[in-house]
């Protein structure tokens, strides 16, 4: 079966973006979409995709090292600044199964985005359209028509997260 670029992307998750070149030997500056250093440090075989140019590359990672808030990545076969320039702007994708396993009360943002949120009574609050990282806890941005509701991801508010059903049940609190 022939796979399209869209098929390749749908089977994977974006973990960051190549934002610039670094040096003359093909290293690139990588901006991670995740706060998990483990995911970035364990990159091996990746798909790079540039949405604007509609071009993709299957590459193997040679090395990864931290540089402030970014990482420097050296890909096999990318050995010059000119070659690195060609992948600038590409998002870096890995297969979902390459993500580290989580504890029961943990989640990846992609598992929560798009979930329908309901009160315990069954009333629909809306759909999760964004997640705000506050430092102490995440906050769901739930939208229904033109109304946005902010729901903190804390035990006092969230009753249950049903990841396979893309459903979250929350307590009906006065201030929500």
Swiss-Prot record:
HAMAP family: Ribosome_mat_RimM. One of its GO terms (biological process) is ribosomal small subunit biogenesis. Binds ribosomal protein uS19. Gene3D superfamilies: PRC-barrel domain, RimM. Belongs to the RimM family. It comes from the Bacteria. It is found in: Cytoplasm. Coiled coil: none annotated. SUPFAM superfamilies: PRC-barrel domain (SSF50346), Translation proteins (SSF50447). GO terms for molecular function: ribosome binding. It comes from Thermotoga neapolitana (strain ATCC 49049 / DSM 4359 / NBRC 107923 / NS-E). This is Ribosome maturation factor RimM. Residues 103-176 form the PRC barrel domain. The PRC barrel domain binds ribosomal protein uS19. InterPro entries: PRC-brl_dom (IPR027275), PRC_barrel-like_sf (IPR011033), RimM (IPR011961), RimM_N (IPR002676), RimM_N_sf (IPR036976), Transl_B-barrel_sf (IPR009000). Keywords: Chaperone, Cytoplasm, Ribosome biogenesis, rRNA processing. An accessory protein needed during the final step in the assembly of 30S ribosomal subunit, possibly for assembly of the head region. Essential for efficient processing of 16S rRNA. May be needed both before and after RbfA during the maturation of 16S rRNA. It has affinity for free ribosomal 30S subunits but not for 70S ribosomes. One of its GO terms (cellular component) is ribosome.
């Amino acid at each position: 079966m022939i796979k399209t670029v869209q098929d390749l992307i749908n089977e994977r998750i974006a973990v960051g973006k190549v934002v610039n070149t670094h040096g003359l030997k093909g290293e690139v500056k990588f901006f991670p979409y995740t706060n998990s250093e483990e995911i970035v440090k364990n990159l091996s075989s990746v798909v790079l995709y540039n949405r604007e140019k509609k071009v993709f590359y299957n590459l193997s990672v040679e090395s990864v090292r931290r540089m402030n808030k970014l990482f420097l990545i050296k890909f096999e076969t990318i050995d010059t600044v000119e070659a690195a320039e060609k992948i600038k702007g590409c998002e870096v994708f890995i297969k979902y199964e390459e993500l580290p396993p989580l504890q029961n009360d943990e989640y990846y943002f992609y598992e929560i985005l798009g979930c329908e949120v309901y009160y315990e009574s069954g009333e629909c609050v809306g759909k999760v359209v964004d997640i705000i990282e506050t430092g102490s806890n995440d906050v769901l941005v739930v939208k229904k028509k033109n109304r946005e509701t902010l729901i903190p991801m804390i035990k006092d508010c969230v009753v249950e997260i049903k990841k396979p059903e893309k459903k979250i049940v929350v307590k009906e609190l006065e201030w929500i």
